[in-house]
Amino acid sequence: MSEVETSVEKHVFEADVAKLLHLMVHSVYSDKNVFLRELISNAADACEKLRYEAIVAPELLGSDPASRITLTLDEENARLVIEDNGIGMGRDELVESLGTIARSGTRAFMERIEAAQNKDGAQLIGQFGVGFYSAFMVADNVDVVSRRAGTDKAWHWASDGKGSYTVSAVDLADAPARGTRITLHLMDEAKTFTSRWTVERIVKEQSGHVPVPISIVEKPGAEPAQVADGTALWTKQKSEISKDDYTDFYRGVAGQYDEPALTVHFRAEGRHEYTALAFVPGSKPFDLFDPDRKGRMKLYVKRVFITDEAELLPRYLRFVRGLVDTADLPLNVSREMIQESPLLANIRKGLTNRVLTSIEKLAESDSEAFAKIWENFGSVIKEGIYEDFERRGQLLALSRFRTTADDDKPRALSDYVKEMKEGQSAIYYLTGDNLAQLKASPQLEGFRARGIEVLLLTCPVDSFWVTTAPDFDGKPFKSITQGAADLAGIAKNDDAAAASPEAGAAVTDFVSFARETLGEAVSDVRTSDRLTESAVCLVAPEQGPDRQLQKMLQDAGRIEGAPKPVLEINPGHQLIAALATCPSEDKAFREDAVKLLLDQARVLDGDRPEDPRAFAERLSRVFGRALKE
């Protein structure tokens, strides 16, 4: 040990890292190869960060400007070394980067990784960005020696993955001139990763398109042999790129191990020139519903990585992975310039249009592939209906919805409009949390009796976009839980064609009595033409949000003093008929019955009785009376 390396700091991993390392060491993954792709990806990132910092500080490159990644195989000592000449790390960066997981989603990762076991393990590693720790899948000890470019100190990080790690200074003679060297002391069952054939195959399959050349040193002291030339895939002609090439590149840029559901590769020419390579993932990224809703498209200038925070796509396309490369921006572009640049505004518009158009074409040419994309990302795309006024019509046409149609398949609005009933002037919808509960909703009864299709909307964003999208193809959207149903002008199906019962005088009197009894608990009580089987239901008044949106806003504390619901009564229901003919002098019983009807409507609406104790007492009194008769 050198004199410099006499002071050794010992640190304990934070709890989440310790747990993660335990999972890695005990290897819940069947595919061990993933560790190499992760470490190469980290090395390539380090090289690109150096290229970026060297724009304003070219002295960082010294006399060695060319980026490279070198893999050294040491079969005799069962070691694999991954070395890059990138930006490198200082002491604090080593502790921060390798001792903690400084990102959200770790707990969710733990839960999923433990549940997954061998299933989908490789994909989870990339999804959660914990690639370095995958080294412990194959190594029982890991040494990291790093020297940050432009500094005169080097540092050694070491761990056996059992709960702690050490950090110490190291002689410059024992460190890279700049960059990072990772030495994996391989487990007995992982010694195959010192085989030239094995490592070269993995590199070509998984990392052949990283924008940094990769070489293999077959044994210590041997000459390096290049196995990947660092050519940027997106600069090639599409005719030169195979499907496997695209898949390998996607896995690198997206950090996922599935296959892309859709690839969009184009070059825009004219006033502004840029190349874009974008992928729609084959599965949901873990951070799809992260509150920050950040995109992951990377911005390159002349093949130099600049940032992945340029917001090159709207938030409702945040699941798209890939990059844009342009030569029309300066390499030292600032964050402010990125936000204000007319070029980037043009890129955002062009890229968004191309991605949406490509998804539309897929919907026409391969409905099965599109259905998978919609299943994974439809709830996110629909955010755009609410947020993107310019493309609202396009997004509505692209969207698919569950409906009351017999085939139970997601439907396009264009198909819905084509099959509207004679006399139907609106697109009807019902919002809620649960599809099964929506299908059992009493508010649907009158629509089913007339064969009117109703959209069943279960995504939280559905309750918002329907309030901002005025219509589709000239047909307004109308909630079946808000205002009057106005179904009288639409004929019922033959099997439900019996005339709707008129509200007789007794029912009219009972409605008035119910209105008086309930008072301010409801905004109104009225007979309904939307009910055919149930006795009662709740709907929202004509003005204000529908029932589901009102609940969401109240739960979030966004509204106070919301309008009370309307209690609708089915005049043809035998219970209503019996109550309507109940002697008026039996007022206490009738009041109990009316309040029980309101609680029944609340339960049918997915709520609970407002006062459970009073509900139970009323129920007992009504049961008691019934048993005496």
UniProtKB/Swiss-Prot annotation:
Keyword list, A-Z: ATP-binding, Chaperone, Cytoplasm, Nucleotide-binding, Plasmid, Stress response
GO molecular function: ATP binding; ATP hydrolysis activity; ATP-dependent protein folding chaperone; unfolded protein binding
InterPro entries found in the cross-reference section: HATPase_C_sf, HSP90_C, Hsp90_fam, Hsp90_N, Ribosomal_Su5_D2-typ_SF
SUPFAM superfamilies to which the protein is assigned, alphabetical: ATPase domain of HSP90 chaperone/DNA topoisomerase II/histidine kinase, HSP90 C-terminal domain, Ribosomal protein S5 domain 2-like
Subcellular location: Cytoplasm
Region described as B: 336-551
Primary location: cytoplasm
GO cellular component terms, A-Z: cytoplasm
Keyword Cytoplasm in annotation: yes
Region annotated C, chain positions: 552-629
Region called A, residue ranges: 1-335
Subunit structure, interactors included: Homodimer.
HAMAP family: HSP90
Family: Belongs to the heat shock protein 90 family.
NCBIfam families per UniProt: PRK05218.1
Role description: Molecular chaperone. Has ATPase activity.
Protein name from the UniProt record: Chaperone protein HtpG
Species assigned in the record: Rhizobium meliloti (strain 1021)
Gene: htpG
